[in-house]
Amino acid sequence: MKYIDLNADIGESYGNFKVGEDEAILPLVSSINVACGFHAGDFMVMAECCKLAREYGVNLGAHPGYPDLWGFGRRSIPYTKEEITNMLLYQLGALSAFARAEGVKITHVKPHGALYNDAVVKVEVAEAVARAVWVFDAEIAIVTLPYGRLFEIASEMGLTVIREGFADRGYLPDGRLVPRNQEGAKKTGDEAVAQAIALAEGWVKAVDGTVIKAEVDTICVHGDNIEAVKLAQKINRELLNKNIYVQAWRKKRA
């Protein structure tokens, strides 16, 4: 029997600005990554997401980013290692308080946007992210691409690393994601569903047609995608057709 974790980035609304359908996607995934107020999210949204994590029994992850509401955390901003570590500790502490109030715990950390991408290629950023998780709680896992600096450094530190693939993003031949400002960056509809199935089976096709080996533990559906709920429904259905079951990565598997 084969299993795969399906995760969604949620909690990216704040104030009167609404993004995604958080509760609608909860029955369709096994893990969530909650924005922690720097790139998106606020104290009311974070509290609600922790409540939903408890009600639906999904893994609760922190989704910290650069302090960049204007750019939705998708702009690379130069910070020192100490600044990056501390900005993550700040965000982890905030989400942890809401999680504790709901009787749940943070199981993983997945950096957001530019911070995620920077940690893949920049040693200093990867070290800062890994250190933040280590000093906050070394039992918490890090979610990242199945290669790159963060994967290597976190593994060397003895942290649990969850290898991630993306249903709705294009891939470069070297396994990195296609930058959002380039052609082929996004996958939609049946193309995204097909890519999710391929990832669950251990491979993915790059924008140039190259087939890449991609052993992943979890597959992401971006919650800010307007078709996220429909996409997650289709992915669930097609995975079942392949006898692949959606299950949170921390649960014991047969």
From Swiss-Prot:
Give the gene name. Answer: pxpA
Q: Could you say which protein family the record assigns here?
A: Belongs to the LamB/PxpA family.
What HAMAP family does its record include?
A: PxpA
What is a biological process (GO) this protein takes part in? Answer: carbohydrate metabolic process
InterPro entries, per the entry: Glyco_hydro/deAcase_b/a-brl (IPR011330), LamB/YcsF/PxpA-like (IPR005501)
Q: Which reaction(s) does the protein catalyse, per the Swiss-Prot or TrEMBL entry?
A: 5-oxo-L-proline + ATP + 2 H2O = L-glutamate + ADP + phosphate + H(+)
Query: What job does the chain carry out?
Result: Catalyzes the cleavage of 5-oxoproline to form L-glutamate coupled to the hydrolysis of ATP to ADP and inorganic phosphate.
Signal sequence segment: none
Going by the UniProt record, its keywords in alphabetical order are: ATP-binding, Hydrolase, Nucleotide-binding
Q: Which domain of life is it from?
A: Bacteria
Class of the enzyme per the UniProt entry, highest EC level: hydrolase
What species is this protein from?
Carboxydothermus hydrogenoformans (strain ATCC BAA-161 / DSM 6008 / Z-2901)
**This protein's record includes keyword Transmembrane helix:** no
Q: What is this protein called?
A: 5-oxoprolinase subunit A
Subunit: Forms a complex composed of PxpA, PxpB and PxpC.
Give the enzyme's EC designation. Answer: 3.5.2.9
Molecular function GO labels: 5-oxoprolinase (ATP-hydrolyzing) activity; ATP binding
